[in-house]
Amino acid sequence: MSPLLRSIFNITKIFNQYASHDCDGTTLSKKDLKNLLEREFGEILRKPHDPETVDLVLELQDRDRDGLIDFHEFLAIVFKVAAACYYALGQASGLNEKEAKCERKGNPLQDRRREDQRRFEPQDRQLEERRLKRQELEELAEEEELREKQVRREQRLQRREQEEYGGEEELQQRPKGRELEELLNREQRFERQEQRERQRLQVEQQQRQRGELRERQEEVQLQKRETQELQRERLEEEQQLQKQKRGLEERLLEQERREQELRRKEQERREQQLRQEQEEATQEEISERGESRTSRCQWQLESEADARQRKVYSRPHRQEQQSRRQEQELLERQQEQQISEEVQSLQEDQGRQRLKQEQRYDQNWRWQLEEESQRRRYTLYAKPAQREQVREEEQLRLKEEKLQREKRRQERERQYREVELQREEERLQREEEQLQREEREKRRRQEREKQYLEKVELWEEEQLQREEREKRRQEREKQYLEKVELREEEQLQRQEREKRRQERERQYLEKVELQEEEQLQREEREKRRQERERQYLEKVELQEEEQLQRQEREKRRQEREKQYLEKVELQEEEQLQRQERQKRRQEREKQYLEKVELQEEEQLQRQEREKRRQERERQYLEKVELQEEEQVQRQEREKRRQERERQYLEKELQRQEERLQEEEQLLREEREKRRQERERQYLEKVELQEEEQLQREEREKRRQERERQYLEKEELQRQEERLQREKEQLQREDREKRRQVRERKYLEEELQQEEDRLQREKQLLREDREKRQYLEKVELQREEEQLQREKRRQERERQYREEELLREEERLHRKEQQLQREECEKRRRQELERQLEEEELQRLDRKRQFRDDDQHQNEVRNSRVYSKHRENKEKSRQLDDSWVRESQFQQDLRPLQDEQEEKREREQEWRSRQKRDSQFPAEQLLEREQQKETERRDRKFREEEQLLKGQREEKIRYLEEDRKFREEEQQLRRLEREQQLRQERDRKFREELSRQERDRKFREEEQLLQEREEQLRRQERDRKFREEEQLLQEREEQLRRQERDRKFREEEQLLQEREEQLRRQERDRKFREEEQQLRLLEREQQLRQERNRKFREEQLLREREEQLRLQEGEPQLRQKRDRKFHEEEQLLQEREEQLRRQERDRKFREEAQILKEREEQLRRQERDRKFREEEQLLQEREELRRQEREPQLRQERDRKFREEEQLLQEREKLRRQEREPQLRQERDRKFHEEEQLLQEREEQLRRQERDRKFREEAQLLQEREEQLRRQERDRKFREEEQLLQEREEQLRRQERDRKFREEEQLLQEREEQLRRQERDRKFREEEQLLKESEEQLRRQERDRKFHEKEHLLREREEQQLRRQELEGVFSQEEQLRRAEQEEEQRRQRQRDRKFLEEEQSLQREREEEKRRVQEQDRKFLEQEEQLHREEQEELRRRQQLDQQYRAEEQFAREEKRRRQEQELRQEEQRRRQERERKFREEEQLRRQQQEEQKRRQERDVQQSRRQVWEEDKGRRQVLEAGKRQFASAPVRSSPLYEYIQEQRSQYRP
């Protein structure tokens, strides 16, 4: 076994091991996949037990989000892991370095390495993205370490301040005479410490500058190396392209050599063929002279056939050569396409390398930004003057670095553009060379075709000459051929006559075989009926036992539920009581219902199923349309993304577009040529088809002539058969007379058996009455009413029969009383047979009622046979029969009641499960235990069923023995009666003549009734056909309307999304512009504030010098003047801000209004155009459907009519041939079959309902588990993201961000939950509808087979009529087919024309859309470049999101594309929300900074005032205290103390 096969075997083995654990054996649950990842891939994954890693793999793996991982998804992750291992192996063994050395030396493994690189390129990209993520995480860790260092420094400063604060307190406690000396010493110490700190900062700054120089030098070296690598790669690419060119040229030369060789061989073959034909012609002339007339004739026929073949095959020969040329052209195009793909892959490799270089540069830039942030932190410890100086130096340095970066970026872009221009020039050169090659190839092809056409013309001229010679030979021997044809026609006629004779014999044998098969089928049906009756009795008993078992199960289930549901128990008990009351009420109502209501319910169910099927189809269509929309949106986004990536090459793209347009023009011309070629070929095919059609018509005419002759003979045969049937009818009438005599004796014996049977049934009924006493009253009332109706009917019949008896007594008054009863019984039986036949046609849908009526009729017949003293027994028997009917009706109702009870039980179980799921998640274990218990009970039930079956079989054997004994007794009695009948035969002969006359009249009346019924059926069938056609038209109209509305809504939605996207882009652009303006204003404001601050400081110094001379009122005036100045300045700023905001809002509203109007106009135009096109398409489809459906409907209607006619004839035959017991047996058999079918269907429905509910519950449990896992995973992801944001942001943003994320999380969870619920609901409805439709189809298939079996006999009798009808239908179909072909050709031309127009319009729209998107993207990029560079966190998040987007996009291309759109939409929404959130945060930050700045200004003003006031006060106290200096020194009013307090307030946490 090869390593590949062994690996595949191991993969499938592992999958099957885990899949067979808990699921259906074909898929993995997420829990099993998690275990598999942790166990099998633990050594490969970086953190195998990390929940983040495993959950991320699970989220990426389950692309269809069904909670299960199938084998395809499992294979995808296995291949990803294998690719990761391959990449890790290369890194560990240092393959990359060795391969780089080999490349410099010209290693021969270079091509193989490129192929591997191309093959594993997506995996390498993903690994690169993961490596970048790890680097970013490491950078975050470094930032955290820096923050911790800063915190430690701040703590040291705080401790130092605390020490100083303690020293100050000690100074205050010391004597006041030493305070000034200690204060001076402390100031000196503080200055020395500051000096040391400045020296240390300078040393650190020098070290950083040296490190920066080293890094810049390294960066320059890296750039040099990268440029060298790029040059080397460019050289390698050029070498590879040259190799490819050489390979292409060699292939083209080789191909030309092959074509020349083929042409040479073909020319030699043609020359050889011409020589052979010339030799054959000479031989034929020689043989003509020597051979006889017959041989010449035969040779002539063969030569004619050859000539026809050559004519026919000359055209395919040309077509074959043409197809060969087309194949060669296709091969050349494929080779060219392959070369272009290879060139494109090389360009993509270079683009990826450039992206890597840019990423490295961005990382270096981030590192420099971090160092700058560290420098800013260090400056916080310096004094204000030093901080100001350092800040200015940093600003200058930042500007210089920004300029340098901008220069480097421009230099890179310039180099990149130069490289791109060179590539573009190379590509243009290649395209020009390609065009030149194509032109050369075209000239060669044209020359070859010209040569070939010349040869073909020569060959055709020679062919024409041969045909002329053949025509001369044909004219010479034409007379002889006519004679030969006459002989052949005579021979054909003889063969046809022989075939007809054989066909008649075969048909006769088939009829005989059919009769034998019918006899066997009747016997089998009788056996099946008996078997079904036995099974029916068994099922009745089983149903009773099942009812008891269900009640026991219900009790146990309620006991178990009481343990877990204390509060819910009361509600469930009330529900159960209500259901029991409802059940009793329904049972009382159902006793009065008949089978008609059941049929109406079935009709309603069918209608509901039809509605559900339509709803499912509509949902399916909507899903398909949604998928198509998502596909369109994906394509549009892909185009936009590609266009954004190529913005910096706008001019080059425009030139490329012009070239592409020219190439497309050429391609369109080529397509037009191909289309014309296809049309020419199609016309040739049409001509061939017309020739074949003419031949078919000729054959059809001959066939019709033969069939006409055959039908005439068949008509003669039918007349003979009709005469024979009349003879047989007479014989049957004779046999019927004899049968009636025998039946009289048989009835007496049957009456005795009936009495015994009734006694046994009475005993069984008594047992049943003991079980069902609670239903007796209601059933008795119903039976009494039925008995009264039955008595009235019997009274009418009795009067009629008494009149008949009186007439018979007048004619046969000399006969004995016994004979009179027999004669009366005979006439009554004949009358009853006629009534039974009519009732059977009328009551096919009410078979239960028919059986009851039949039993009553039998009772009446028995009462007439017996004497009057048995009338009391008859009443008791009627009562017993009523009890039998009652028991049977109850048995019939029992399955329905059981089904309803089971439904209620299932509903209760479902509700209780829902409540348990909401309150007790641990109840899943109980459900599994219940499932095991149900399986155990089912096993016990099957064992009990087998025992009961054995008991029933013993009972049936006992009844069979009794029946045989009675039959023997009846045989003995029959022999005795036959002796008596022989004596009376002479007397009855005269009576039989009169009876025959009555029978004839009876048959005539019966025939009239049949004709009326036939007419009614025809009318009913036509009415149904019209209704069906009308329904079909309405459905089609409704579907068209729905389709049109759906497309209209989709178009509106697409336009709205586009408008929303444009508005969003415009709004983001304006927001960024406003942000930039606000930042500029803030900077100006800061400069203004700085200028004001310096001005105030100078003013304060001047004021301090003049403060001694001024009075106390002057500081107050100055403060008032400063306050007014600040207030006015603040008012001016607020007004300017308000004016800017109003102007911005006004511009935004105007632009939004203009965009809205334009988009509305475009949407209206597009909607009207598409609406017109859709209406036209729908009309065409409707006409096509109607044309296709009309012949089918007509055939279906005729077929149904013939089947119904055959059914009626078959029933009439069976009624005439079979006896009354057979009719009864057939009726009972059908009834039992239907009962059994109903029970089987109900049992199957119950089973399906149980399985469906079980699957739904299991699915609900899985969905809940999946939902919990998703929530847990989302929660962890959000918590981690929140932690990162909290570290990066300041303390004042925490509360606001937390609230915003919680609201966003709630919204997403609600939307996700709603989508999941909607999807699950639709899936369950579809599954249920599919089951119902499958059940309906199976039922229809079974009914159809049953009808087909019954109709076989009648179809064969009417074979001749069908032939005639089929011939008419065939001719109509031929005409319709021709019309459809012509219509299809016309539609094809119209479709081609429309397709070309649509293609051109789509091309124009695409180009306009492309330009608009390019313009918008260009503006967007220009605005993005102006954003603030210090937004590091936003940049990092965007990179992470883009990397995730690319990884998910690559993964989704390998798997199912249907889910990609949803994920991308969520990703875009998240980015949009993130962008808006950041914008709101920044705006809020800006407001906070402004407020903080105002507060700081106010605090500075107050502080300066308080400082001035305290200095004045201190000076006054010093001047006043001349006698007692240092007595009360103002320690807290010094500027040094205020400075310390300010520093402490800044660094205090």
Swiss-Prot record:
Which residue ranges have biased composition labelled Basic and acidic residues?
Answer: 171-180, 262-278, 317-335, 349-359, 850-884, 895-918, 925-942, 1489-1523
In which residue ranges is the amino acid composition biased (Low complexity)? 336-348
Q: Where does Ca(2+) 1 bind?
A: T27, D32
**What does the record say about tissue specificity?**
Found in the hard keratinizing tissues such as the inner root sheath (IRS) of hair follicles and medulla, and in the epithelia of the tongue, hoof and rumen.
| Annotated segments matching region Disordered | 97-125, 157-180, 262-359, 404-448, 782-803, 839-942, 980-1000, 1489-1549
- Description of post-translational modifications: Substrate of transglutaminase. Some 200 arginines are probably converted to citrullines by peptidylarginine deimidase.
| Free-text comment on this protein's domains from its UniProt entry | Consists of nine domains. Domain 1 contains two EF-hand calcium-binding domains. Domains 2-4, 6, and 8 are almost entirely alpha-helical, configured as a series of peptide repeats of varying regularity, and are thought to form a single-stranded alpha-helical rod stabilized by ionic interactions. Domain 6 is the most regular and may bind KIF directly by ionic interactions. Domains 5 and 7 are less well organized and may induce folds in the molecule. Domain 9 contains the C-terminus, conserved among different species.
Similarity comment? Belongs to the S100-fused protein family.
Q: Which residue stretches belong to region 23 X 23 AA approximate tandem repeats?
A: 938-1507
In the UniProt record, does the keyword NADP occur?
no
User: Species name for this entry?
Assistant: Ovis aries (Sheep)
Looking at the record, the residues that make up the EF-hand domain are 23-48, 49-84
sequence repeat boundaries?
413-448, 449-476, 477-504, 505-532, 533-560, 561-588, 589-616, 617-644, 645-678, 679-706, 707-742, 743-771, 772-796, 797-832, 938-961, 962-985, 986-1021, 1022-1044, 1045-1067, 1068-1090, 1091-1121, 1122-1144, 1145-1167, 1168-1197, 1198-1227, 1228-1250, 1251-1273, 1274-1296, 1297-1319, 1320-1342, 1343-1368, 1369-1391, 1392-1416, 1417-1439, 1440-1461, 1462-1484, 1485-1507
Q: How does it assemble?
A: Homodimer.
Give the residue ranges for region: 14 X 28 AA approximate tandem repeats: 413-832
Q: What does this protein do?
A: Intermediate filament-associated protein that associates in regular arrays with keratin intermediate filaments (KIF) of the inner root sheath cells of the hair follicle and the granular layer of the epidermis. It later becomes cross-linked to KIF by isodipeptide bonds. It may serve as scaffold protein, together with involucrin, in the organization of the cell envelope or even anchor the cell envelope to the KIF network. It may be involved in its own calcium-dependent postsynthetic processing during terminal differentiation.
This chain's protein is named Trichohyalin
- Kinase as a keyword? no
- Give me the ranges of the annotated region S-100-like: 1-91
**Cross-referenced SUPFAM superfamilies:** EF-hand
Q: Which residues cross the membrane?
A: none
Q: Which CDD domains match?
A: S-100
